[in-house]
């Protein structure tokens, strides 16, 4: 174990110093994906002028309507983001944060980081109990769990710099949905009963919104959010200052002060969304752009793709034991590196160029045995941890001019803390749990972190969110992303591999069964749908196969050679919708 750790550190150091490794030549790139229909089992939604894919049908229609009115992809994305804060309160939000990947019609690709920040009064050991162990109640359900929200700042930055419509126009549909209400769908009803019951009933402000006659709202009930509508109206009228310096800031700060939270008006006034350079890589002739730190997603998607490029994935075939073995082993190495090197780049030096280098990937590829799995303990030791659920949301937008936007944002766990700030109607995040409360001990998603992701004032916690844009021959080819905690990275990875290596259209790639390995716990998690024979072969190779529930909820758009848009929403989310015109 020590030798393996030293080997990885030596390789990283060598790459930072300009070293190299000699390996075999790469396999030839696969043929381009087919856009035919006769031979396909799953068929994507088609449109020519613009398209939106999101987890909620109402929000998707809001975005398409903005596109029809002449708005661009950024205008539509901001409208969808605010709409989801109303219609998908499990994760859609203005009290949380996230990331946006954006590619303009002129070919500029950029990343907007609106991840939450730790308050000024945050301390490294704030989530430890008297025995020095992490206290999940503090980091998940208390007022201490909330970081300074970033969604409003992120949407405003994107709209001001890259949009064409005013804020008071794109936010108007969300205000209407909040004030007039909408019919609760299956997904919201189920999540209120399953997850909401754990956090919402303890808080009267929250219970007054989402409960009726002592029970969570059911499918078919109307959810009206008058106070949230008033908050959105303030943002429409006064811009982000309403949230960060005005009446909404007062509500959040007062809520925190009354209940032992840390966010102050100074924290809110000092929050800034940041535009960053995306992580980029080349995979079999395609350019892949994804989020840089404090998201770990982009680095590790590119890292794993670089490793896979040393194997003939097309020859192995989708769902084969060899393909799954190689991908699982590559994922182990990437997640081990995540725990060691990743954090907020404004606070720690993240060696992302070394981690995403072809040479480093080839060195790892040389360690992968197609016929024998390497135990995670031989990559780096750590503790076992529980499985996680889908508790984030993603949406994708492409407009008639070729502008493309991918957004993943969240409250962290479903409904966040369950706390509504005063009379604002705004649910608050529990994103502070994404910090490493104690190095080497897993968070709610089973992810192990180190000192690079320790709690510090004004720091942004590490994330797995991975909004991703793939480019072919200089043009946007795939816009994708997913919720799913630690499985976000591997879900997005499989969308890329399924389309590029296995020639699937976007609907086929979305419907295909998924699998996941995150190094710790040392198990290969698989959805239903893989052949029992394949799973037996994987076990014979040394994989510890565990059948799990559905993974991820991708919302993706593929652009054909002629500009035709092909979209697909994930069947794992029953109320999502892809639509265009």
Residue ranges, per PLM feature:
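Alpha-helical support elements that line or immediately flank enzyme active sites
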Residues: 66-67, 153-161, 238-245, 250, ...
């Amino acid at each position: 174990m020590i030798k393996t750790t030293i080997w990885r550190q030596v390789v990283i150091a060598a790459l930072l110093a300009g070293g190299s490794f000699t390996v075999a030549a790469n396999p030839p790139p696969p043929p381009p994906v087919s856009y035919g229909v006769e031979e396909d089992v799953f068929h994507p939604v088609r449109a020519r002028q613009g398209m939106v894919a999101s987890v909620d049908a109402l929000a998707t229609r809001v975005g398409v309507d903005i596109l029809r009115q002449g708005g661009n992809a950024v205008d539509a994305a901001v409208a969808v983001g605010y709409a989801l804060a109303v219609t998908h309160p499990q994760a859609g939000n203005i009290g949380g944060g996230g990331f946006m990947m954006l590619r303009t019609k002129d070919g500029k690709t950029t990343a907007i980081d609106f991840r939450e920040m730790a308050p000024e009064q945050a301390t490294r050991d704030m989530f430890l109990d008297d025995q020095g162990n992490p206290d999940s109640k503090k980091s998940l359900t208390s007022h201490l769990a909330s970081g300074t929200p970033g969604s409003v700042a992120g949407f405003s930055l994107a709209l001001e710099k890259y949009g064409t419509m005013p804020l008071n126009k794109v936010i108007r549909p969300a205000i209407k949905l909040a004030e007039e209400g909408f019919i609760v769908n299956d997904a919201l009803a189920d999540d209120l009963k399953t997850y909401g019951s754990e956090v919402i009933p303890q808080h009267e402000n929250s219970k007054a919104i989402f409960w009726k006659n002592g029970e969570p709202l059911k499918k078919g009930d109307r959810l009206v959010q008058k106070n949230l509508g008033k908050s959105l109206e303030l943002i429409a009228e006064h811009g982000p200052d309403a949230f960060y310096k005005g009446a909404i800031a007062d509500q959040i700060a007062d809520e925190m002060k009354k209940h032992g939270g840390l966010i102050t008006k100074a924290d809110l006034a000092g929050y800034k969304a940041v535009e960053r350079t995306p992580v980029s890589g080349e995979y079999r002739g395609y350019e892949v752009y994804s989020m840089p730190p404090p998201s770990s997603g982009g680095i590790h998607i590119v890292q794993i793709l670089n490793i896979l490029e040393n194997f003939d994935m097309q020859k192995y075939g989708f769902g084969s034991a060899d393909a799954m073995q190689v991908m699982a082993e590559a994922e182990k190495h990437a997640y081990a590196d995540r725990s060691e090197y990743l954090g907020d780049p404004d606070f720690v030096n993240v060696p992302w160029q070394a981690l995403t280098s072809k040479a480093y990937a080839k060195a790892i590829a040389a360690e992968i045995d197609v016929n024998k799995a390497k135990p995670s303990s031989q990559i780096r030791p750590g503790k076992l941890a529980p499985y996680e659920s889908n508790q984030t949301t993603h949406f994708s937008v492409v407009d008639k001019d070729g502008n493309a936007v991918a957004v993943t944002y969240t409250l962290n766990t479903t409904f966040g803390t369950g706390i509504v700030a005063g009379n604002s109607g705004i649910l608050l995040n529990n994103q502070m749990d994404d910090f490493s409360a104690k190095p080497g001990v897993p968070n709610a998603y089973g992810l192990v972190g180190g000192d690079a992701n320790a709690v510090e004032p004004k720091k942004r916690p590490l994330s797995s969110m991975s909004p991703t844009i793939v480019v072919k021959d200089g043009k946007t080819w795939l816009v994708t992303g997913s919720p799913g905690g630690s499985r976000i990275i591997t879900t997005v990875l499989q969308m890329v591999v399924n389309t590029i290596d296995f020639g699937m259209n976007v609907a086929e790639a979305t419907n295909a069964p998924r699998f996941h390995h995150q190094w710790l716990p040392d198990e290969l998690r698989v959805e239903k749908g893989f052949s029992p024979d394949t799973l037996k072969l994987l076990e014979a190779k040394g994989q510890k196969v565990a059948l799990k529930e559905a993974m991820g909820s991708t919302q993706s758009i593929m652009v054909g050679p002629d500009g035709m848009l092909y979209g697909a929403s994930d069947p794992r989310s029953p109320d999502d919708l892809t639509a265009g015109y």
